[in-house]
Amino acid sequence: MTHALLIGNPNCGKTTLFNALTNANQRVGNWPGVTVEKKTGEFLLGEHLIEITDLPGVYSLVANAEGISQDEQIAAQSVIDLEYDCIINVIDACHLERHLYLTSQLFELGKPVVVALNMMDIAEHRGISIDTEKLESLLGCSVIPIQAHKNIGIPALQQSLLHCSQKIKPLKLSLSVAAQQILNDLENQLISKGYKNSFAYYFSRRLAEGDTLIGEKAFTESLLIKLQETEQNLDVLLADARYQKIHEIVTLVQKKHSDASEHFTAKLDKLVLHRFLALPIFFAMMYLMFLFAINIGGAFQDFFDISTETIFVQGSGWLLQQLHAPNWVIALVANGVGKGINTTITFIPVIAAMFFFLSLLETSGYMARAAFVVDKAMRAMGLPGKSFVPMIVGFGCNVPAIMAARTLDSERDRLLTVMMSPFMSCSARLAIYAVFVAAFFPSGGHNVVFSLYLIGILMAVFTGYILRKTTLKGHASPLILELPAYHRPSLRRLLRETSLRLRFFVYRAGKLIIPICVILGGLNAITWGGGISSGEANTDSLLSIIGQWITPLFAPMGIHQDNWPATVGLLTGMLAKEVVVGTLNSLYAQVGHVGEITAAHFDFWGGIKAAFGSIPANLSELGSALWNPVSASAADSELSQSVYGIMSRRFDGAVGAYAYLLFVLLYIPCVSTMAVIRQEANKRFMWTSIVWSFVVAYATSVVFYQGAKFLDHPQQSMVWILAMSLSLLFVLAVFRYSQYGMGRQNAAANT
């Protein structure tokens, strides 16, 4: 077996290459002692097994105790500590000179290295030609030109790993005699301490460049003190010598012609990064994403809903009736498992549309600019602009967004990002929005969704601002970001990335929604006295009693006593937000007897025909929905007979529904999010997030509902608005003074 490390600069296509090499044969875990994700994969080449470990993206192997993220520290330590046979160094052919800096450091390890020269097609498009044979000769290692996103050059790279045994010699750097003597002395001292010759050479260079995390602490500190006494700026001298050597190599192997794409990028950036137009363009892009997801994705939603309802709910119920199964079995299978499958599959088109648009923004190069644009606004409030990059990931799922905060250098910025990320509307929340938009906002539903996403962003910023003024005081670290050139992503790549994200989401949602629907169906079938009902909802069921008991707590935000399924949805949503849709769909169906199946009413082919017929019908209304959302009407004539119809009767109109959506947006994160907050921060931060999000959600929903209904009952509304305002101020005061101890404890834990 051959074990190879995959390393390269950020945004060099390393992850794309890792996926191309290993396909689905991947494992994800954590590096020992830290929470940084560790990805390994393998593939067979004939009968030879090759294992790949994907290291975090880094610009340099120098690991300093201050100003380095966990990702960078892991990469720097892994090249020393792990047992491996060779290194695959991924280089962006468009930025050869900058990427060879890391290559020069890797050569000093004395290990076999294969250079994967990626994005050759993009380089050619930009007028860059590279003589790979001459580059291979000058570096002294294999150089394989590849296009990872098109799987071009991958077989040649795989073959090179079979013959990767030649140890690489370091590049010869032009240093002064005095500087070279100091490095030789360092190397000899390390050898006398028991280090192998190759590691002694490598460590001496890292120490000279200011690395404080390698070797024995006491010994390396003494060497660093001696270095400071030499009055030689070895780190600067080494960096200058590296760039000088790299420039010589690049001059010999690279030719650059006129680059039309650079001119196009520069012209477009004048508009996209304009001082006054940048933020409006950013919000316009976000708005287009929700417009695309709700209208384009929503056009196919009825197809998935009707077809899966016909097959898994009505079909399974009809089949069990033919087998004379008991009513409780029919209820559990049809309205439990069947309704769970129906719920999971129904919101696939909306989620897929959003993932597709996100992938388009990311691969085109705009998303990096979005972080740059938002940085100025966030830094004005003392918040780190870098936080917005992980927070954008939160539009898909809050869990990876919080985990992505590991890439931030500052501990303060990392904790701020962890606490702000749960307010970003994840794709599971989008599924809930889509259901309510169909029931209550058939015209201009994308405007409703956009407002919710915007409120989530504003609440995240507000939370960060409060933390900056209390627990996490300090200055925001500067944003250093590489802005890639704009390019047109291939449809194949967009579909592949959308498919990968969608499969993960559906798998995660399905394995939660289906069991929850079965459990809810069981609780709804069991009466308080221990009997079994026929499967229809009744006021004596355990679920009904629990829901009715808790519902009065939510009365100020418009949830009335007969709308107890909405309360149960909030409770199950604490497990996972995608479960809310399954809960509402299951309970409202049983309350309204929508799930009752009879042999006389079941028409399989009629249901399938109606499902296919919904696609052209919805697409024909797409133009009016996009260009004239006010006059467009998507009201369904059969809405009153469906779950949507039951929902519209139970909620207090559009106002009550929007108040409910505000609570869903802001309240307690799901179990997975809470767990990762505890993992990335500590228990106190987790509980702070839970309490803060619940208070903010409740206060915001109540204030909105009471404000909207102010004319109906002005005195009652005024009391509730004042009460919520005072409660929020009280929590802020408690938060300010009680968090001081938490901040000190956390600071101590991280020193």
UniProtKB/Swiss-Prot annotation:
It is found in: Cell inner membrane. NCBIfam families: feoB, PRK09554.1. GO terms for molecular function: ferrous iron transmembrane transporter activity; GTP binding. SUPFAM superfamilies: P-loop containing nucleoside triphosphate hydrolases. Belongs to the TRAFAC class TrmE-Era-EngA-EngB-Septin-like GTPase superfamily. FeoB GTPase (TC 9.A.8) family. The gene is feoB. This is Fe(2+) transporter FeoB. The chain crosses the membrane at residues 276-296, 341-361, 385-405, 422-442, 447-467, 512-532, 539-559, 657-677, 685-705, 715-735. It comes from Legionella pneumophila. It is a multi-pass membrane protein. GTP 2 binds at residues 33-37. GTP 1 binds at residues 8-15. GTP 3 binds at residues 54-57. Probable transporter of a GTP-driven Fe(2+) uptake system. Seems to be required for optimal intracellular infection of macrophages, to be important for growth and/or survival in iron-restricted amoebae. It also plays a key role in extracellular growth under iron-limited conditions. It comes from the Bacteria. PROSITE patterns: G_FEOB. Keywords: Cell inner membrane, Cell membrane, GTP-binding, Ion transport, Iron, Iron transport, Membrane, Nucleotide-binding, Transmembrane, Transmembrane helix, Transport. GTP binds at residues 118-121, 147-149. GO terms for cellular component: plasma membrane. Residues 1-167 form the FeoB-type G domain.
